[in-house]
């Protein structure tokens, strides 16, 4: 018997043990016939000259099986063959950065016990007046086969060896109708009929499952190539679907995982992309392309530590562009940390914006840092907008290993900021849920624990205050809301609720004050504006009431109650203006320069305010615009101005030693004198004597 031909085996699995496992697992899913039905009508002869095979060429491959004992045996694989398999399976030719290469070829390996009995080498199949070589041959592109015929005087030839099952004869012309699919000689204990030759889909399979799918027309390398084409065209969803199908066939291929990560990145599903890259690195720790993708993803997520780990991993020359981005990100994060420690929130906003502009455009923690800065600056609406812009990653995504920002796990930090913003806007139930989740993620961090405790106390105080208000116990409700404000001194909801209590108690000044606190952080807070406008009406400050109602009318164009309140306030204001004119009020500050005019002004009925000022004094110049505002705000009050430099005799008669000085008279009697008062104190004094 002649030499046994050893042909190359296509790389098809990640490991020999993997093939044993997969073939055994999927064997029951495949219906493999024990033999092929053949027509017995072909006249052949066993007389075939040995020299007749000298001109044989490559032919279409046919299924070859060994003796019946070969199916039950467990042939061993040499160490050299295992090495060739391992080398082949580490190839990542399917990477997006380099277009798909040709498919590896598939040929048969004849193991011991599977040698042909022909001493001439390649057996021949006779068809009509020609005979054909049955040797499998693949083109360099990994697929094609051909057949070359030679004329022979012999008309009845039976090929040597065991091409046909025992007792069966090939039908004339059968070789030309044989399937063009390539064959793979497999190992293992699975039942594949006679021998271990099974059909292959052209190469690229990695397991028994891959062989099965290939029979249905699916090929992982072809799917990868199609996915790459879709990716280049910008059809990322279609590319992702194709990569998914390739991974289903070959889950142990790192290149497929990396390509899937690229498609997910293009779809802005960064959390899932990170997980795919991590899986690719787990499969092949030396896969540099996956490390590079991971570094780029971590830079976009603002995770500098993880990015550095993959940019500078052992055996890889760092990409200078990524390295520069990493260093810039680290610089901005460091400056942001320093600004937060000293409460320089404007600098913190500036540094987070710079880090995002540098490429960390999908970092939840950086956007949360900006939201925290706005929250501390009492700009609640801006903070809420930032929270709404926080990138939504896969809810199963967690940085691996965990990354911290400001000493907190980044996921816990983001949840803490969201909880505080929710609490400031009255979304108390959401605040509790997020604070509890943050505490679960970072149980030992004191700042996270403090946020959770504060949220719970504020929610408890608000609930207690609402219950007391509903039962008509307004004074006790004020105390309950005040307890909540001790924990969160900028909570606009608690201020607004307490303002409602003050209104019910008839303390309209306090109601206006609490509404002002609420509107300081939320300028468009509708409830606070409604309550302040109503309080202004009770105080007779109709001009201020009209301003609030006009704003509410623009915000609530379909609200009939707001429209009625606005008309009523305007009517009252007009009537008051006409009344003031009839009584001699002119709604502007009047200058007084002589002692006689001063005495006449003091004798006017009602409240009169005299402002002694100097044109060269800075404080006088600062408070003068406010006096003009008060003149319009309180039309039933007389406002006068005395320039001490121009009326020195009057200033001396009134003993004016420092400016600005204010003197108040009611019905001709002096009731109060103030030197350099604050705006609030001056207005409070006017309101006190006006009522």
UniProtKB/Swiss-Prot annotation:
Disruption phenotype: Altered vein pattern in cotyledons and primary leaves. Mutant seedlings show increased sensitivity to osmotic and salt stresses in roots. Keywords: Phosphoprotein, Repeat, Stress response, TPR repeat. Signal peptide: none annotated. Expressed in embryos and organ primordia in shoot and root. In primary and cauline leaves and petals, is expressed in hydathodes, guard cells, petiole cells and cells associated with differentiating vascular bundles. PROSITE patterns: TPR, TPR_REGION. Induction: By salt treatment in cotyledons and cold stress in pollen. Repressed by auxin (e.g. IAA). Residues 19-39, 83-93 have a biased composition (Basic and acidic residues). GO terms for cellular component: cytosol; plasma membrane. The keyword Iron does not apply. The thioredoxin domain is inactive. This is Inactive TPR repeat-containing thioredoxin TTL3. It comes from Arabidopsis thaliana. The lineage of its organism: Eukaryota, Viridiplantae, Streptophyta, Embryophyta, Tracheophyta.
């Amino acid at each position: 018997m002649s030499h046994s031909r050893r042909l190359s085996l296509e790389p098809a699995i990640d490991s020999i043990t993997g093939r044993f496992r997969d073939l055994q697992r999927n064997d029951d899913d495949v219906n493999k016939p024990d033999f092929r039905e053949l027509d017995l009508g072909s006249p052949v002869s066993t007389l075939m000259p040995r020299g007749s095979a000298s001109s044989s060429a490559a032919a279409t491959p046919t299924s070859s099986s060994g003796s019946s004992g070969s199916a039950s045996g467990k042939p061993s694989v040499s160490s050299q063959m295992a090495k060739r398999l391992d080398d082949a399976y580490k190839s990542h030719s399917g990477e997006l950065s380099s277009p798909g290469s040709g498919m590896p070829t598939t040929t048969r390996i004849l193991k011991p016990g599977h040698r042909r009995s022909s001493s001439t080498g390649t057996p021949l199949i006779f068809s009509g007046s020609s005979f054909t070589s049955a040797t499998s041959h693949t083109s360099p592109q990994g697929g094609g086969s051909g057949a070359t015929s030679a004329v022979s005087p012999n008309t009845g030839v039976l090929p040597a060896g065991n091409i046909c099952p025992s007792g069966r004869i090939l039908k004339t012309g059968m070789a030309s109708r044989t399937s063009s699919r390539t064959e793979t000689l497999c190992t293992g204990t699975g039942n594949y009929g006679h021998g271990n030759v099974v059909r292959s889909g052209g190469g690229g399979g990695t397991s028994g499952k891959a062989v099965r799918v290939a029979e249905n027309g699916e090929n992982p390398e072809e799917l990868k190539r199609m996915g790459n084409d879709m990716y280049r065209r910008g059809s990322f969803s279609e590319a992702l679907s194709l990569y998914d199908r390739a991974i289903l066939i070959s889950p142990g291929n790192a290149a497929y995982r990396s390509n899937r990560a690229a498609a997910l990145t293009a779809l802005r599903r960064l959390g899932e992309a990170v997980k795919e890259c991590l899986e690719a690195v787990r499969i092949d720790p030396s896969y540099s392309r996956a490390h590079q993708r991971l570094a780029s993803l971590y830079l976009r997520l603002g995770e500098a530590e993880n990015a550095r780990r993959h940019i500078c991993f052992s055996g890889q020359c760092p990409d200078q562009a990524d390295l520069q981005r990493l260093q810039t990100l680290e610089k901005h994060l460091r400056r942001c940390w320093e600004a937060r420690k000293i409460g320089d929130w404007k600098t913190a906003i500036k540094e987070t914006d710079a880090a995002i502009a540098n490429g960390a455009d999908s970092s939840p923690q950086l956007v949360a840092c900006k939201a925290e800065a706005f929250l501390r600056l009492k700009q609640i609406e801006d903070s809420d907008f930032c929270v709404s812009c926080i990138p939504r990653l896969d809810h199963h995504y967690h940085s691996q290993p965990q990354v911290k920002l400001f000493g907190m796990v980044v996921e816990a930090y983001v949840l803490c900021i969201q909880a505080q913003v929710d609490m400031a806007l009255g979304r108390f139930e959401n605040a509790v849920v997020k604070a509890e989740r943050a505490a679960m993620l970072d149980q030992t961090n004191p700042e996270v624990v403090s946020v959770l405790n504060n949220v719970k106390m504020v929610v408890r105080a608000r609930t207690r205050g609402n219950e007391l208000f509903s039962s008509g116990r307004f004074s006790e409700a004020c105390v309950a809301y005040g307890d909540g404000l001790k924990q969160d001194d900028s909570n606009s909801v608690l201020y607004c609720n307490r303002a409602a209590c003050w209104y019910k108690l008839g303390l309209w000044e306090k109601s206006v004050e609490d509404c002002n606190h609420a509107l300081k952080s939320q300028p468009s807070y509708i409830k606070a504006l409604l309550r302040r406008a109503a309080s202004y009406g009770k105080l007779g400050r109709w001009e201020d009431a009209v301003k609030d109602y006009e704003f509410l009318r623009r915000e609530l164009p379909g609200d009939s109650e707001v429209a009625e309140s606005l008309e009523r306030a305007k009517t009252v204001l007009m009537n008051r203006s006409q009344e003031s004119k009839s009584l001699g009020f002119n709604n502007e500050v009047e200058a007084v320069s002589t002692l006689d005019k001063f005495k006449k002004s003091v004798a006017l009925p009602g409240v009169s305010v005299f402002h002694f000022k100097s044109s060269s004094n800075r404080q006088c110049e600062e408070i003068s615009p406010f006096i003009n505002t008060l003149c319009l705000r309180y039309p039933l009050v007389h406002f006068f101005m005395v320039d001490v430099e121009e009326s020195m005799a009057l200033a001396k008669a009134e003993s004016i030693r420092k400016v600005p000085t204010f003197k108040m008279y009611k019905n001709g009697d002096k009731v109060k004198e103030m030197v350099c008062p604050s705006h609030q104190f001056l207005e409070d004094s006017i309101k006190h004597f006006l009522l």
